[in-house]
Swiss-Prot record:
Keywords: Acetylation, Cell membrane, Cytoplasm, Disease variant, Lyase, Membrane, Metal-binding, Osteopetrosis, Phosphoprotein, Zinc. Changing H94Y: In OPTB3; partial loss of activity. Changing H64W: Impaired activity, rescued by 4-methylimidazole (4-MI). Impaired activity, not rescued by 4-methylimidazole (4-MI). This is Carbonic anhydrase 2. The active site is at H64. Changing N62T: Reduced activity. Zinc. Can also use cobalt(II) with lower efficiency, but not copper(II), nickel(II) and manganese(II). It comes from Homo sapiens.
Length: 260
């Protein structure tokens, strides 16, 4: 594999298994959500998203996407309920997006791709820290939210406006007082299944919770995502687009729905 993993022809998702053999594992993500096969599970609880005390710290271009990082030293922004046992603490969120509006999401719904997908990453507090949590089958809970292009999402604009300052790999900026509640849709109806990180090391530690209702963002907002760079400053420009892993085999897994 050339150099390091990425999304290009020579280091993209079809090559990842060479360095990360779990890429061909039994609970890989993302997957296609077949709405006709997903089974309504009346025992699933409503999701509890408590982000009112969230403390954002920083935004970082890591050369694969950009992460908005949170203070996870206390139970400030937590996810509970739904398919989860216990409390999961928000550590960061990031997006995956396309070069065109017709692709970009990682999960698909009846094979439909959205323009982008938001991942809010939480770790199970019973494991003490994120690094230990990723070693456990129930270590992480990732809330996945689809983005479609339409009217602007006001709650996203603060993110969009800072992207100029983190154009290239390794750049970061202070990013405080951001309220992630502004990125949620009205409905918290969801699908859930056991899966993995969608980027190397692809660890099989994630309870996925994918919301049925997409959020709407404007074409101008998503265009700003596409102006970011995979490369570092002073290197040849490679636009940060199509940073998504395609759907993986469902294998022996059942996707459950919280709604009829």
């Amino acid at each position: 594999m050339s150099h390091h993993w990425g999304y290009g022809k020579h280091n993209g998702p079809e090559h990842w298994h060479k360095d990360f053999p779990i890429a061909k594992g039994e609970r890989q993500s993302p997957v296609d959500i077949d709405t006709h096969t997903a089974k309504y599970d009346p025992s699933l609880k409503p999701l509890s998203v408590s982000y009112d005390q969230a403390t954002s710290l920083r935004i970082l271009n890591n050369g694969h996407a950009f992460n908005v990082e949170f203070d996870d030293s206390q139970d400030k922004a937590v996810l509970k309920g739904g398919p989860l046992d216990g409390t999961y603490r928000l550590i960061q969120f990031h997006f995956h997006w396309g070069s065109l509006d017709g692709q970009g999401s990682e999960h698909t719904v009846d094979k439909k791709k959205y323009a982008a997908e938001l991942h809010l990453v939480h770790w199970n507090t019973k494991y003490g820290d994120f690094g230990k949590a990723v070693q456990q089958p129930d270590g992480l809970a990732v809330l996945g939210i689809f983005l479609k292009v339409g009217s602007a999402k006001p709650g996203l604009q603060k993110v969009v406006d800072v992207l100029d300052s983190i154009k290239t790999k390794g750049k970061s900026a202070d990013f405080t007082n951001f309220d992630p509640r502004g990125l949620l849709p009205e409905s918290l109806d969801y699908w859930t299944y056991p899966g993995s990180l969608t980027t190397p090391p692809l660890l099989e530690c994630v309870t996925w919770i994918v919301l049925k209702e997409p959020i709407s963002v404007s074409s101008e907002q998503v265009l700003k995502f596409r102006k970011l760079n995979f490369n570092g400053e002073g290197e040849p420009e490679e636009l940060m687009v199509d940073n998504w892993r395609p759907a993986q085999p469902l294998k022996n897994r059942q996707i459950k729905a919280s709604f009829k």
